[in-house]
A protein has these predicted regions:
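Bacterial N-terminal signal peptides that target proteins for export
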Residues: 2-15
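C-terminal motif of bacterial Sec signal peptides marking the signal peptidase cleavage site
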Residues: 24-27
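Bacterial signal peptide processing site
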Residues: 29-31
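N-terminal capping segment at the start of a domain
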Residues: 49-93, 106, 148-149, 297-305
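Active-site-adjacent substrate-binding region
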Residues: 63-66, 112, 116, 226, ...
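Solvent-exposed, acidic/flexible segments
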Residues: 65-72, 85-96, 140, 157-165, ...
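A non-catalytic alpha/beta surface segment that caps or lines the substrate-entry region
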Residues: 78-136
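Acidic/histidine-rich catalytic neighborhood of metal-dependent amide-processing enzymes
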Residues: 151-253, 262, 270-273, 278
Length: 320
């Protein structure tokens, strides 16, 4: 059977029907020490221009189940063009319109949840976007990303979180066109980033906490068989470690899929521990896995620009 990107994993995730005991797990923050490189290398003008284009060795869609890494790269570029996109800004409103327009063009029917978040900076208007793709059975596979950027001067967030937003848009393009065994929902969260400089609860994960609470009230939270979060997945030297705060069974499954596809060099077995949007759901008993490379030297710096993004990396993550 020829499966679209993520289909192997989505089918396998649907088998994880056993309830998960309620956990309290530890946007995006790692226990590992990371930071910007002390000195940026000197790069020629030609090299800089080339870095603004998709990689020549990006695998074609026919090799990645239909996922088009170059299309995803273009989605990253479009987000970067809007500039810094912190929650409540004019730029994030433009991104919201872009996401909604793209989803509608794919035949998806996006739902928008507009809400007001209480933050250290006062009330901020935010929006979650959710696509519900029907399936033949009631179980739900939830794919997710955040689309806001950290409020830092000149921070355009090509990787954090332009890359994962682009991956989810490309998956929506493929998945909205067909009906699967289980429902697939794709969520775009606002407000993952802390408003203050430091990540401290409750100043983070505004959008994912909002959605998890609403789904708990509606009863849909109990129908989620697996929650797959992507965040910071576009690096040219992508290395995704196993998150100790993700469900072990689901992590094992994803890493096995990656190995079988030949991506063991990207999905590595080194451990890490990440605080991210997945914990809004894992603390409510949902099986979750976080796909993220937080050990990038340009994390939360103005150097998180389009030239750091690899269309090949986007294709690899989308394929898995």
């Amino acid at each position: 059977m020829n499966m679209i990107p993520a289909a192997r994993l989505l089918v396998a995730c649907a088998l994880l029907a056993a309830p998960l005991p309620l956990m309290v797990l530890a946007g995006c923050k790692s226990n590992d020490a990371v930071g910007p490189a002390a000195h940026a290398p000197v790069v020629s003008a030609a090299a800089k221009a080339a870095a603004q284009m998709p990689d020549e060795d990006t695998p074609p869609p026919e090799k990645t189940g239909g996922f088009d890494g170059k299309r995803a790269f273009a989605d990253v570029a479009k987000q970067v063009d809007f500039g810094p996109r912190p929650s409540g800004s004019q730029a994030i409103a433009q991104v919201q319109d872009y996401i909604l327009s793209e989803l509608s063009s794919y035949g998806c029917t996006p739902d928008v949840d507009a809400f007001t978040a209480e933050t250290p900076a006062g009330q901020i208007a935010m929006k979650n976007i959710l696509v519900k793709i029907p399936g033949d059975r009631p179980g739900i596979i939830l794919l997710a990303t955040h689309y806001d950027t950290k409020k830092i001067a000149d921070f355009v967030g090509a990787d954090d979180a332009g890359s994962s937003t682009a991956v989810m848009l490309e998956l929506a393009r493929l998945l909205c066109a067909q009906r699967g065994r289980y429902q697939v929902w794709i969520a775009f969260f606002d407000g993952e980033e802390a408003v203050n400089l430091q990540w401290k609860d409750p100043d983070n994960r505004y959008g994912s906490r909002q959605m998890a609470a609403k789904l708990a009230i509606s009863g849909d939270l109990a129908k989620i068989r697996a929650f797959l979060l992507a965040d910071i997945v576009g690096s040219r030297e992508l290395r995704i470690k196993r998150d100790a705060n993700s469900d072990k069974m689901l992590t094992d499954l994803m890493w096995t899929v990656a190995k079988n596809l030949g991506y063991s060099g990207v999905f590595v077995n080194d451990p890490t521990a990440i605080e991210d949007d997945h914990q809004s759901f894992s603390t409510r008993g949902v099986r979750t896995v976080d796909v993220i490379d937080l050990e990038i030297p340009y994390w939360h710096t103005p150097q998180d620009t389009l030239d750091k993004i690899s269309s090949k990396s986007l294709a690899v993550v989308g394929h898995v």
